[in-house]
A protein has these predicted regions:
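Transmembrane beta-strand segments of Gram-negative outer membrane beta-barrel proteins
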Residues: 31, 134-135, 153-154, 159-174, ...
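Short acidic/polar hinge/loop motifs at secondary-structure boundaries
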Residues: 79, 106-107, 114-140
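N-terminal periplasmic "start-of-domain" segments of outer-membrane beta-barrel proteins
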Residues: 31-61, 88-92, 107
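Outer-membrane beta-barrel translocator domains and adjoining extracellular loop/strand segments
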Residues: 183, 208-214, 245-252, 297, ...
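Extracytoplasmic beta-strand/coil segments of soluble accessory domains associated
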Residues: 68-114, 283
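Extracytoplasmic loops and strand-loop junctions of Gram-negative outer membrane beta-barrel proteins
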Residues: 119, 138-139, 166-169, 201-206, ...
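N-terminal periplasmic accessory domains that precede
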Residues: 67-70, 90-94, 107-111, 124-126, ...
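Transmembrane beta-barrel wall of Gram-negative outer-membrane proteins
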Residues: 174-203, 208-246, 271-289
């Protein structure tokens, strides 16, 4: 009889604790809408590999010297040559684009709905206004073919479109090797439309000899909400980079001797590039109902490019 009572006593505290109410606080997170999948969808409901990065509050806390600052800690994405402003940033997604000698190949780049990738598959980001980047969507895997042939991945970049931000903003970023980025953003808001003006002046002498660059970027974006179902966006971007020097590669013994020196051929041939880039485009968005919409865009680009290579033809 004593043993039976002892067993009941041991079980009794278990029933007491099992009736304690759960004290874990529950937090409801806002839905994340993905726009790079052609149809706006909830991130939890799409069977795709998508990464979304929002920089609305964070863009003022990075150097903004390269687009690689906006793609850190993204699975399957690798960047290199972020400090070589002559050969520009190289990006690969799951191996696509890794064999590119310079620039970006095999990956579709879209800025505010307008393709930044040329018909031959080459992409450049030297005209991207980094101070206006508000969000980045990265689509990996074979579903990137929704955006065209040979798309090993898609990077959709959205710039500032919210006129509720500060109507005038000045910012200055300074770093080592005489790096400076002076930016001014002006937002003019009307009843149903707004105009965003952004100017970025960037300079740097570079870590190595013959690796400095100079760039001026002007970006205008006009947004007009015609009614509840129609919206028109007009934008123009102009970039003037009179020089971006290329220091070239070094051998191991040259690195051990002086890692900041430039390759001799690059100095002898004065290797650099010069770019003037103009892009303008108009997009129209028509929303028929909650389940269907129509997007159309027209754009024009002109790129004046000059470069000097470290060898004879």
């Amino acid at each position: 009889m004593f043993v039976y009572i002892n067993k009941i006593f041991l079980l009794f505290p278990v029933f007491i604790f099992s009736n304690v109410q759960d004290s874990i606080q529950k937090i409801d997170l806002d839905n994340v809408i993905v726009k790079s999948t052609k149809i706006n969808s909830n991130k939890k409901e799409i069977p795709l590999s998508v990464s979304i990065k929002n920089f609305r509050d964070e863009r003022n806390y990075n150097s903004q010297s390269s687009f690689s600052d906006f793609t850190r800690n993204t699975p399957g994405l690798f960047t290199s040559s972020s400090n070589n402003f002559s050969q520009d940033l190289r990006i690969s997604i799951r191996g696509f684009g890794a064999r590119s000698a310079f620039g970006i190949r095999g990956i579709k780049l879209i800025v505010d709905g307008i393709p930044e990738t040329t018909p031959d598959g080459q992409s450049q980001l030297d005209n991207l206004p980094l101070g206006l980047v508000s969000s980045v969507e990265i689509l990996r895997g074979p579903n990137a073919n929704l955006y065209g042939n040979s798309s090993g991945g898609v990077i959709s970049i959205n710039t500032l479109s919210d006129s509720s931000e500060k109507h005038s903003r000045y910012s200055g970023i300074f770093g080592a090797y005489q790096y400076q980025s002076l930016q001014r953003t002006r937002v003019i808001d009307w009843n149903t439309s707004s105009l965003i003006i952004h100017y970025d002046k960037r300079r740097s002498n570079g870590y190595r000899d013959q690796s400095g660059y100079k760039s001026d970027i002007l970006n205008l974006k006009y947004i007009n909400d015609l009614d509840n179902k129609n919206k028109i966006v007009w934008q123009i971007n102009y970039t003037d980079s009179p020089y971006a020097y290329d220091a070239g590669g070094l051998k191991l013994n040259e690195v051990e001797n002086d890692r900041r020196q430039a390759r001799k051929n690059n100095i002898d041939y004065d290797t650099y590039e010069k770019v003037k880039h103009l892009k303008t485009g108009v997009s129209w968005n028509h929303k028929r109902n909650e389940n269907s919409f129509f997007d159309s865009y027209f754009f024009y680009q002109k790129r004046d490019f000059f470069t000097k290579l470290p060898f004879n033809f």
